[in-house]
Design a protein with these regions (language model features):
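Non-heme di-metal
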Residues: 1-64
Length: 64
């Protein structure tokens, strides 16, 4: 069984991964001209934003 500290560390890493992924999508969006591809990347980026919020909430719950 994981301790709260271990779980918090794990999900802090997950949070950082999600932030990094969102940044990659944003950088690609800025450099592309193809509206279809941009639309897909924006959708994925928005999903990453949701993952970031969920990871933050999960970390809060673990730490409480």
């Amino acid at each position: 069984m994981y301790s709260r500290e271990a779980l918090s560390d794990i999900f802090e890493r997950v949070l950082q991964f999600e932030i990094d992924a969102k940044t990659v999508y944003e950088e690609c969006i800025e450099k592309l001209d193809d509206e279809t591809v941009i639309g897909v990347l924006q959708t994925i980026r928005n999903e990453e934003k949701g993952h970031i919020e969920l990871a933050k909430r999960l970390i809060e719950l673990i730490q409480d």
